[in-house]
């Protein structure tokens, strides 16, 4: 029987930097112990992601090709309607996903027909027996409560980077506004999906600082996506080189150590990794992947390649819902 892992919310930046600086084998050994204690049987959740509203976003996030401030080739598109979204959810379920994530390229949710359609999509996804996740920017208390009533499982709202590096990446929304959005989601009884991106010119100290903020949230976010920058032409970060995959492995391992009960999701940038690097990420503590053909506006490995990846790694797909995992 594996011993229970201590859950902490008081990690210091220096402690986290020390973890990030560990020899790789030592770091993986420690992360493995935590991961096996929190994920007996080594299961990986499969999540599918659909962009419901693509492009034309008012925010100026330097990494994002959907921003209207940048010159990428992503143009604004009207929102998808309820029926085709639910058809995509059904297809995702048939392919093996048990979580369906829907994204809107908005600064914030506004009341009206698009929000009513969002509520119908959430209810429809839940009726399929899937977890439903939404990412759509900031929201009000009332909107969070209505999403909860519709059955929303999780709301994604990433920190993106450290408080210190934040203003170099985004100027149209403050770091504090992100924290306030997370609090509204929690108060409504919806689980948090909150992580960040590495490879945007930040320092190791910035990575530690971002993880410190995430780990200080009590309880920890139920899902923590770790993204590697996908540098897209036409964005301010287009010339940044891809990060070393080992840096992503290290980030996932430390995230697992800091937040033992959270799902650590290997997210954007996975399509740039070799199969071997992806397996290292799973070994380091990732227990969820976006599965299928589309990850918002960047590519993602095809379904069969993902199935083969899991077979090669010797892990099982899908285990418990986020709420069941926390209660286990």
UniProtKB/Swiss-Prot annotation:
Residues 42-267 form the Radical SAM core domain. Pathway: Cofactor biosynthesis; biotin biosynthesis; biotin from 7,8-diaminononanoate: step 2/2. [4Fe-4S] cluster binds at residues 57, 61, 64. It is an enzyme of class 2 (transferase). Keywords: 2Fe-2S, 4Fe-4S, Biotin biosynthesis, Iron, Iron-sulfur, Metal-binding, S-adenosyl-L-methionine, Transferase. PROSITE patterns: RADICAL_SAM. SUPFAM superfamilies: Radical SAM enzymes. One of its GO terms (biological process) is biotin biosynthetic process. SMART domains: BATS (SM00876), Elp3 (SM00729). HAMAP family: BioB. Catalyzes the conversion of dethiobiotin (DTB) to biotin by the insertion of a sulfur atom into dethiobiotin via a radical-based mechanism. This is Biotin synthase.
């Amino acid at each position: 029987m594996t011993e229970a892992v201590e859950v902490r919310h008081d990690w210091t930046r220096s402690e986290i930097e020390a973890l990030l600086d560990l020899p790789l084998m030592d770091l993986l050994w420690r992360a493995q112990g935590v991961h096996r204690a929190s994920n007996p049987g080594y299961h990986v959740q499969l999540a599918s992601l659909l962009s419901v509203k693509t492009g034309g976003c008012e925010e100026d996030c330097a990494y994002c090709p959907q921003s209207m401030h940048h010159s990428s080739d992503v143009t604004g598109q009207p929102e998808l309607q309820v029926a085709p979204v639910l058809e995509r959810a059904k297809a995702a379920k048939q392919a093996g996903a048990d979580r369906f994530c829907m994204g809107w390229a908005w600064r914030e949710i506004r009341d009206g027909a698009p929000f009513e359609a969002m509520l119908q999509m959430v209810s429809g996804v839940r009726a399929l027996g899937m977890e439903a996740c939404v990412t759509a920017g900031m929201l009000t208390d009332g909107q969070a409560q209505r999403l909860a009533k519709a059955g929303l499982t999780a709301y994604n709202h990433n920190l993106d980077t450290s408080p210190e590096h934040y203003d170099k990446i985004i100027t149209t929304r403050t770091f504090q506004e992100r924290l306030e959005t997370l609090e509204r989601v929690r108060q409504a009884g919806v689980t948090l999906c909150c992580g960040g991106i590495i490879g945007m010119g930040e320092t190791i100290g910035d990575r530690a600082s971002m993880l410190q903020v995430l780990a200080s949230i009590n309880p920890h976010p139920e899902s923590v996506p770790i993204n590697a920058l996908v540098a897209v032409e036409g964005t301010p970060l287009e010339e940044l080189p891809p990060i070393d995959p080992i840096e992503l492995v290290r980030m996932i391992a430390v995230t697992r150590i800091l937040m033992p009960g959270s799902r650590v999701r290997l997210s954007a940038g996975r399509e740039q990794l070799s199969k071997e690097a992806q397996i290292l990420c799973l070994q380091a503590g990732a227990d969820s992947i976006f599965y299928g053909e589309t990850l918002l506006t960047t590519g993602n490995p095809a379904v069969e390649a993902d199935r083969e990846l899991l077979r090669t790694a010797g892990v099982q797909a899908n285990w418990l819902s986020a709420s069941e995992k926390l209660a286990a």
